[in-house]
């Protein structure tokens, strides 16, 4: 605030917000509405109606992390429409594919599926998932692309794209991309240009770097294809490494081997036991689909907004100055011919818990890094993973479930410079847990580069003044609501403010 008058006005606004929230809560309790355990039907109603469609391409068996990512993915199979799982090659595994390893994980899932249904509806049967497993060509990279290289996997991608379904189809590439390349090759060889463009416009691709030479071919030959990647085989330059990076200066407990053993692997039934020990890095492939989880934060159609899978900007990346011999697997970075969604940088200051007074407040140590766009959410998505793994063996009463958050105003609003703004939300918890609110500005997600001062960020409502701007600017505010269950679970709401002069 620039003066005491502004501060008084904002405090009045906050008082009004508090009275409104108190009245709403009292009315709810008067009607018998309390934060209690909910029925499966009510739990289904709170899920996003719109599920994202997904096909996974995996070189499972080349590294234990594919199996780890598969274990996690199946725990979210009720909120993501898995439409195919294709066994592929990669630079690490060039001449054979391993669908039997996918089948083994799904068999383990089948042993716990009935218990998962006690917590949320919609988990598919193991038999339904087994039917989605397909084989890609047992060839490396572009050797498997062209006439005579159709495979069960490439034909399945085409069949799935052609479904009468308006939702985008996400292709999550954990290894080589040549099965997708072959599908695109066949589409171009058998369809009109207009039809190819229509079908390609339905695709959304996220590849974990380039693990064969087909990724650059795809990007060059299909310049309008929505594509997220850090090009080449220089894994150290990739955003996805934020999932398992040990970051000096923060608590890295939730990616430790001890944490995985306690919360994922041991005492969590057949699926937990199927989660292998880390060999190189934990779950390097998971970021390619993590942003599809409906949590109130992620919008996959806007990679520049940021979310559990990281944040990305659309531009044509330069070829970095590096020794090609250092590229893992021998997949070099080629010059990009068009913009792709790739590394973006966040200047992130982790919040800290207050021992006294304000429960949560801004910390003092900041990090400016592209990997921070992902690891900043890591404790939240790791705790979410642990809770879902608990669901495989525990009753509903024994486990924790995420809070439900609702805004008290639209998620997109417009104000003029100098106007006073108030936002509020209310949340309930299906287990009756106490909740902590935390509001913060996400500067990199919007166009306004300045910091906006707000009232106490750990209240259910905040107040602020729209900053002075010379042209329309957008500002993103995030509300994170975390319960005090074990493990603590978080859900979010995003408010996008357009400020006009």
Regions found by a protein language model. Name each.
Residues 465-471:
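Short, surface-exposed loop/turn segments at beta-strand-coil junctions that are enriched for proline
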Residues 14-26:
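Bacterial N-terminal signal peptides
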């Amino acid at each position: 605030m620039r003066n005491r008058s502004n501060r008084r006005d904002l405090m009045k606004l906050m008082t009004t917000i508090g009275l409104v929230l108190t009245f709403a809560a009292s009315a709810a309790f008067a009607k018998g509405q309390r934060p209690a355990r909910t029925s499966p039907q009510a739990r289904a109603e709170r899920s996003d109606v719109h599920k994202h469609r997904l096909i996974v391409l995996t070189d499972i068996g080349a590294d234990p992390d594919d199996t780890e990512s598969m274990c996690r993915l199946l725990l979210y199979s009720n909120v993501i429409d898995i439409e195919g799982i294709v066994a592929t090659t990669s630079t690490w595994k060039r001449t054979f594919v391993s669908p039997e390893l996918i089948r083994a994980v799904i068999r383990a899932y089948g042993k716990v599926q009935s218990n998962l249904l006690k917590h949320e509806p919609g988990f598919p049967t193991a038999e339904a998932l087994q039917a989605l497993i397909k084989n890609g060509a047992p060839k490396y990279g572009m050797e498997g692309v062209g006439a005579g290289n159709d495979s069960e996997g490439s034909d399945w991608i085409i069949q799935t794209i052609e479904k009468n379904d308006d939702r985008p189809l996400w292709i999550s590439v954990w290894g080589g991309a040549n099965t997708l390349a072959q599908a695109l090759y066949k589409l171009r060889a058998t369809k009109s240009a207009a039809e190819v463009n229509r079908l390609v416009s339905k695709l959304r691709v996220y590849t974990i770097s380039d693990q064969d030479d087909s990724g650059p071919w795809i990007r060059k030959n299909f310049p309008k294809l929505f594509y997220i990647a850090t090009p080449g085989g220089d894994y150290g330059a990739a955003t996805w490494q934020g999932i398992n990076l040990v970051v000096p200066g923060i608590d890295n407990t939730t990616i430790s081997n001890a944490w995985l053993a306690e919360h994922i692997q041991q005492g969590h039934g057949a699926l937990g036991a199927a989660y292998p020990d880390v060999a190189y890095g934990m779950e390097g492939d998971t970021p390619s689909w993590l942003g599809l989880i409906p949590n109130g934060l992620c919008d996959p159609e806007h990679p520049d907004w940021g979310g559990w899978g990281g944040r990305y900007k659309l531009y044509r990346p330069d070829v970095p100055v590096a020794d090609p011999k250092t590229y893992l697997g021998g997949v070099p970075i080629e010059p990009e011919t068009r913009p792709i969604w790739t590394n973006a940088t966040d200047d992130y200051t982790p919040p800290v818990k207050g021992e006294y007074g304000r429960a949560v407040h801004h910390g003092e140590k900041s990090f400016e890094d592209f990997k921070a766009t992902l690891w900043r959410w890591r404790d939240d998505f790791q705790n979410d993973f642990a809770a879902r793994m608990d669901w495989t063996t525990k009753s509903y009463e024994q486990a924790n479930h995420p809070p439900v958050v609702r805004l008290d105003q639209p998620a997109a609003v417009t104000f003029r410079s100098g106007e006073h703004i108030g936002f509020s939300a209310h949340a309930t918890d299906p287990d009756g847990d106490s909740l902590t609110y935390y509001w913060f500005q996400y500067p990199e997600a919007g166009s306004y580069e300045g910091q906006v001062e707000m009232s106490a960020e750990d209240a259910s409502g905040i107040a602020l003044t729209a900053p002075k701007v010379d042209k329309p600017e957008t500002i993103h505010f995030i509300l994170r609501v975390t319960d005090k269950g074990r493990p603590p679970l978080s859900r979010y709401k995003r408010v996008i403010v357009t400020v006009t002069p």
